Amino acid sequence: MGLLGSAPPTAGVDSGRLFAAGVTYICCGAWTLAYDCFVRSAHEDAPTRYNQALCCFMTRWYEECHRLLAEAERLLDDKPGKGYCPGVPSMSQRQPPEAFRRWDADSELPRCPLLPETPRDDALTLILRLRAEAAFRLKRYEEVRTIAARLGLRYKHLENLLKPIDR
């Protein structure tokens, strides 16, 4: 069986191992191997869909990336226990120190995997930031504006996407 072969999805402990392997491959920039692991895992949740989307984005398959991110956002809002990031509950008062907030706002989109333990608000932010990037490449400029507004216009990389649109 080769890469992206016709292996059926794997359930149980092996599914968890495939997810973990996919995360490791993302960290190494091995996008094809990571994508294959996530496809073969039987996970149908927001972290898996986001991680697949990140692999698609990095290989310039923007249409599929965008589709997977829409599904990840929908799964994130699903009922607890079915396709969402259980992680730490959302805490609107939770704020990192100022230095971290500045760094985050000024940084490019992180190319990191989404883990099941990620707090819901942080997961949604990662999903939306990547979705804005994919929408920009698909020339869906109104969606980029909408996402930037949803995120409070606080990310410099989104401002940079909006500059050529608004000219």
PLM region spans:
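"A position-specific structural signal for the A-helix of alpha-solenoid helical repeats
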Residues: V13-G16, A20, N51, M58, ...
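Boundary/linker segments of alpha-helical solenoid repeat arrays
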Residues: A46-N51, L75-V88, L153-I165
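Flexible helix-coil transition and linker loops at the boundaries of alpha-helical arrays
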Residues: S6-P8, F38, D77-S92, P97-D121
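Alpha-helical segment of the N-proximal tetratricopeptide repeat
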Residues: P8-R40, L130
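Inward-facing hydrophobic residues that define packing positions of alpha-helical scaffold repeats
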Residues: W31, F38, L69-A72, L76, ...
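Structural signature of alpha-solenoid helical repeat junctions
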Residues: V13, E44, P116-P119, A123
